């Protein structure tokens, strides 16, 4: 029986690497995978692939707020059987797209593995994360560590001087050095 999985963490936990490894495992067994990533991530570099920090890459389809994932996946699956759907940057999904993914699991019987952030730099849930936390069959937290050695489960946004940014757009792209994964204790110490 297929399930909807949500793999979440703070930044720099290896979510994309884990996604690409999962896809490879399916492909190694002769199974087809279909990968998606968020258009907002691709707009900066006009890319249509998923790339991990350690250099692994794979081509991917792009989703934006208007993408009907159930319809797209149904068409591709009808042409040739898909064995697994993998979504990178799933925190950018909207409510209807998470519903689409539940239909992929329940109607098409295809497992869906979603990888993304749980919260933003203000410790607020992203839309996709909110609905995946509500509707996923399995929730799996990927671990990374704070500079103190505790598990990091929050993200701070910092400026060029190393000062914490407390306000601004939820979505901002730039160097990964603008974000620091920290534990709850150090989030509150630095953020407040």
From Swiss-Prot:
ATP binds at residues 9-16, 88-91. Its EC number is 2.7.1.21. It catalyses: thymidine + ATP = dTMP + ADP + H(+). It comes from the Bacteria. Zn(2+) binds at residues 146, 148, 183, 186. It is found in: Cytoplasm. Keywords: ATP-binding, Cytoplasm, DNA synthesis, Kinase, Metal-binding, Nucleotide-binding, Transferase, Zinc. Gene3D superfamilies: 3.30.60.20, P-loop containing nucleotide triphosphate hydrolases. The active site is at 89 (proton acceptor). GO terms for cellular component: cytosol. InterPro entries: P-loop_NTPase, Thymidine_kinase. The keyword Ribonucleoprotein does not apply. GO terms for biological process: DNA biosynthetic process; thymidine metabolic process. It is an enzyme of class 2 (transferase). GO terms for molecular function: ATP binding; thymidine kinase activity; zinc ion binding. The keyword Chloroplast does not apply. Belongs to the thymidine kinase family. Homotetramer. PANTHER family: THYMIDINE KINASE, THYMIDINE KINASE, CYTOSOLIC. This is Thymidine kinase. It comes from Blochmanniella floridana. The gene is tdk.
């Amino acid at each position: 029986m297929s399930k909807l999985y949500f793999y979440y963490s703070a930044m720099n936990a290896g979510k994309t690497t884990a996604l690409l490894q999962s896809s490879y495992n399916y492909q190694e067994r002769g199974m087809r995978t279909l990968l998606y990533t968020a258009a907002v991530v691709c707009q900066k570099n006009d890319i249509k692939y998923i790339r991990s920090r350690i250099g692994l890459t794979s081509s991917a389809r792009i989703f934006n707020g208007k993408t009907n994932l159930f319809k797209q996946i149904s068409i591709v699956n009808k042409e040739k059987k898909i064995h697994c759907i993998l979504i990178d940057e799933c925190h950018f999904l909207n409510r209807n797209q998470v519903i689409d993914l539940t239909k992929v699991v329940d109607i098409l019987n295809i497992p869906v593995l979603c990888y993304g952030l749980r919260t933003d730099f203000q410790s607020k849930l992203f839309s996709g994360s909110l609905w995946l936390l509500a509707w996923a069959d399995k929730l799996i937290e990927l671990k990374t560590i704070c500079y103190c050695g505790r598990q990091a489960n929050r993200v701070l946004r910092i400026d060029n001087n190393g000062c914490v940014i407390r306000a601004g757009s939820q979505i901002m792209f730039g160097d990964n050095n603008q974000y620091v994964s920290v534990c709850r204790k150090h989030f509150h110490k630095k953020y407040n």
